[in-house]
Amino acid sequence: IAAFYQCSFIQAIELTRDANESIGSSSISLRKHAVDSSIPSDPPPLVTEAQHFLYNLPPLHQAGFEGQGIRIGVADGGFYNADSLPALPQEHWLGYADFTDEKNDIFGTKGKHGAMCLTAIMAKSDSYQGAATKADYFLFRTEEPDTESPKEIDNWVAAIEMADSLGLHIVSTSLGYTTFDTEVFNFSYADMNGRNSRGAQAAIIAARKGLLLIVAAGNDGNKTWHYISTPADADSILTVGAVDIFGEIAGFSSFGPSADGRVKPEVCAVGFQTVLVDPSNGKLINSNGTSFACPLVAGMAACLWSALPNATNMEIRERIIRSADRY
């Protein structure tokens, strides 16, 4: 914490809870507990460069590669107010689909988690630079607002199928599953092998078809279940953990390896005090969660793919993995 006070762009730090205090129940999804805190702030212009600098994104932006020609899907819960937020220019919207029981209410009052993730990658204003502001976006609502059931995995699989049909390049997924309202459906760590869940199976098929899937690792690193969730366990995708702007791992970031011994997460990005746009009022905030690290990597992948338009999804994935400081 002391190191943060030395940063000129941080005006104040306020601890919202004791470090040992439990946050929520592990039985809820990543969507519901991805945000550990939301602390209003007023960062100086382009403070987002600090979180982009960690993986050397500014040179791509400076070279003119900001996601042009890349189509990105964002699969999540609600996208509250995203359709009227000035920082999210609608000229880069391809459309949206709602796979939940509520149908076509993705911009309604139930849930802003998806909108917050979207701002990390898409938003642009005088004081904010998303990771890939010139890419085009399609939104998928797959999370039921009031229940936790395997149906949500089926919703996500349907969204990935649509993403393939639409010719998208990348899908950013800030959700994950381990336990459900009905315990008989719960996963064990042994299930996190990239083969057992329908979500992991669909992710592998999508990768074979050319999609690059970016998935949040989960926020259970400091809980009894401290492993990744699914579909983050899938092979041939990029699972993203959370660090601070200095590269130090966030305590809540879920651990690997997968149950069959593969390295997970493959990469990390800034998910501690990530600068975002609050969809409720358009102000800048700082929030925590691998949910917010995930779209940053998706945006970086889009910019890299803009620079290397003939690359395959697996080539982009491999370049990103090789860029990691612990590769």
PLM regions with names:
Residues Y5-F9, M122-D126, E161-L168, I204-R208, ...:
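Sec-exported extracytoplasmic/periplasmic mature domains
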